Amino acid sequence: SVHRFFRTFAKNQEYNMRIGIIVAMDKELRQLLALLSDTIEEKSGGKTFYRGRMSDDKELVIQQCGIGKVNAAIGAVEMINAYHPDSIISSGVAGGATTLVPRFHVVASTDVVYHDVYCFSDNAYGQIQGMPERFAADRKMLEIASKIENVHPGTIASGDWFVDTKGKAGEILDHFPEALAIDM
């Protein structure tokens, strides 16, 4: 579960840094706030941040950004400007793309691909012109996350439209059969 993931991650002595977490929805925010102690609600740049401690004095800053890649990017920039975290984790609910990952397990991205982008044949499907095909995860964080029970490292396909049918999921998996999870 996400609780076990963040508790275990925060206890890891190899990673003694300030971690920022961005989430899209209120339900995701409430789950994470339940893990913090000494929580302080702060406002910066018109945004609300929650700063607190989890396990052994590890400081976390959490923000609910709203749904979509643009909101996540804006939230990450606001968090960087206000708190200067060493790392930012985007956390949230995603659809399972394979039966290899049981329900309620965590997928830690090795890389993220866009499932809703096509910039013609000069680029790979999902690649924005001038950008990489895939966005790689931080190797040190991935190494730590991979040691946690019920965490599965793999590709996450992310986009800005809700994948609400098996047909849509199938189209995404036609392009990215290695994906373990589909975001939105």
Protein language model features and the residues they cover:
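Short pre-catalytic strand/loop immediately N-terminal to key active-site residues, enriched for Gly-Thr
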Residues: 61, 176-182
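Generic structural signal for well-ordered, non-membrane alpha-helical segments
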Residues: 21-25, 29, 69-72, 134-142, ...
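Proline-aspartate-enriched helix->loop->beta-strand connector
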Residues: 84-89
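Short, Lys/Arg-enriched N-terminal segments with co-localized hydrophobic residues
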Residues: 3-16
